[in-house]
Amino acid sequence: MSELNTKTPPAANQASDPEEKGKPGSIKKAEEEEEIDIDLTAPETEKAALAIQGKFRRFQKRKKDSSS
């Protein structure tokens, strides 16, 4: 499932004729983003945030140490 789809060329969904690109009906409407409601006071959210912050701090420290 993590494999990239190599069968479809990258420009397959783009209009090939430059005149078609300007037409309003030729461009597909972007899929609306799904709004996700996250409970910021939940213990699971706090635990995940602390884990992400810790990893980011370690990354920044390693980045700083390697550039010195």
Curated annotation (Swiss-Prot):
Q: Where is the composition biased (Polar residues)?
A: 1-16
Note the InterPro entries from the entry.
Answer: Calmodulin_Regulator_PCP4-like
Stretches the record annotates as Disordered: 1-42
Annotated Basic and acidic residues bias: 18-31
Name the keywords, alphabetized. Answer: Phosphoprotein
Give expression by tissue.
Answer: Expressed in laminar and nuclear structures of the CNS.
Q: Origin, by domain of life?
A: Eukaryota
- Tell me which residues make up the IQ domain: 45-68
Q: Which residues carry this modification: Phosphothreonine?
A: 8
Family as reported in the entry's similarity comment:
Belongs to the PCP4 family.
Q: What is this protein called?
A: Purkinje cell protein 4-like protein 1
What is the species of this protein?
Mus musculus (Mouse)
